[in-house]
Amino acid sequence: MRKIYLNFLFITLSLSLFSSSIDNNIIERELKVHKTPTCGCCKKWIEYMTNEGYTVSAEDHENLDKIKKFYGITPAYRSCHTAVSSNGYVFEGHIPSRYIEKFLKEKIPNAIGLSVPGMPLGSPGMEFGDRKMTYDVLILFKDGSSEVFATVSK
């Protein structure tokens, strides 16, 4: 009986340790996108993110200024849509999914999210044939500052 109990205890502890190590590596893949009702490139970015394995819901607004201001996105960092993860991070604009995943894994102190300001040609949702431009993915910080997180080349 004691051997059964010890085996049970060992299995329980092993599963507990295993599941906690798995939980630390899970990337949150749920986004709520705030956009205007007529924006076609926003719809394309949502489709792209869905194809990348994200669960995406969209909410249409006639004016996004209040939402962007609420989430701390100053005018210099704005784009046509604002995505918010279930854990509160913001992803402004046409950000490639690989950088969102990298950002979520790194857990950068004082960061509120990422931004691709404007609508760079060739970014996800802004495809136009073979035309592409180089652009930066910025980390946005609580104090309103930013720094380059990645540069996406042609």
Where are these regions (language model features)?
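Bacterial Sec-dependent signal peptides at the C-terminal "C-region" and cleavage site
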Residues: 15-25
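Positively charged n-region of N-terminal signal peptides that target proteins for export
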Residues: 1-6
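Thiol/selenol-based redox catalytic cores and closely related redox-interacting motifs
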Residues: 76-154
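N-terminal, post-signal-peptide region of Sec/Tat-exported proteins
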Residues: 46-87, 93
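Bacterial N-terminal signal peptides
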Residues: 7-16
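Active-site-proximal beta-strand/loop segments in catalytic clefts of secreted hydrolases
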Residues: 34-36, 59, 94, 117
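Local sequence-structure signature of Cys/Sec-based thiol-disulfide redox active-site neighborhoods
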Residues: 24-52
